Amino acid sequence: MKVFILALLALTATTAIAQLETTCSQGFGQSQQQQQPGQRQLLEQMKPCVAFLQQKCSPLRMPFLQTQVEQLSSCQIVQYQCCQQLAQIPERTRCHAIHIVVEAIIQQQSQQQWQEPQQQAQHKSMRMLLENLSLMCNIYVPVQCQQQQQLGQQQQQQLQEQLTPCTTFLQQQCSPVTVPFPQIPVDQPTSCQNVQHQCCRQLSQIPEQFRCQAIHNVAEAIRQQQPQQQWQGMYQPQQPAQLESIRMSLQALRSMCNIYIPVQCPAPTTYNIPLVATYTGGAC
């Protein structure tokens, strides 16, 4: 009996996902043809999550079951499939996979529903749903997955120049200013404090969706100024101390600047630095 029930539930969930596949293929149109093979594969893998987040599943009515038997629904089955698929995706790719899920749902909504001012409410609702994936699946999902937009070489250079104060501060290439009037009971500002203020001010002027990339540029600038032998190979013995030093410096941004910075910035593949930066209260 239990085998029959589980088989029926699985069949229902499969039917729901099959219907979703038809909807997806109609909703994407030409944009789906432009997707890269990796994106199409991720979308196929994440279709249970799309179905669950859209609640395109309804409880199964089985009046023949006894009341003490758990009434599993097709949503529960799809939820399980969503978590199972998400767990199989590497952590570094989950943020991209979540964006694909959001994009799939947006594509299936009528364009009128995504116009201002309704757009902000829709995005807020979607963000809350995605944040629940972490608890629902009991796996790590980035709390805030910022849309990773491609920047041109000129924009990359501008970002790096804009955050030169941050590079200077994180490297502590500033020294206290000598004030010849120590008897004056006034806080003695240092050049480091001035650079810190400039860093926070520059970072606050960068749009949120580019701050993660900006932080990478800072780390890259610091890396390039280190002796090359310290950065050869991802697992060189002398490298962990350097990586930990930079990671701790980047974490200092959370208490240094009172602005939003992505909770976890995926590290570039060229140098696997676990960049982590959030914000807490406190002005520059």
UniProtKB/Swiss-Prot annotation:
InterPro entries per record: Bifun_inhib/LTP/seed_sf (IPR036312), Bifunc_inhib/LTP/seed_store (IPR016140), Glia_glutenin (IPR001954)
Q: Does the keyword Cell wall biogenesis/degradation apply?
A: no
One Pfam family linked to the record: Gliadin
Q: Does the keyword Signal apply?
A: yes
Molecular-function annotations in GO: nutrient reservoir activity
* Keywords tagged on the record: Disulfide bond, Seed storage protein, Signal, Storage protein
What the entry lists under CDD domains is as follows: AAI_SS (cd00261)
Record PTM text? Contains disulfide bonds.
Q: Where is the signal peptide?
A: 1-18
Q: Which family does it belong to?
A: Belongs to the prolamin family.
This chain's function reads:
Seed storage protein. Might be integrated via inter-chain disulfide bonds within the glutenin polymer.
Q: What is this protein called?
A: Avenin-like b3
Species name: Triticum aestivum
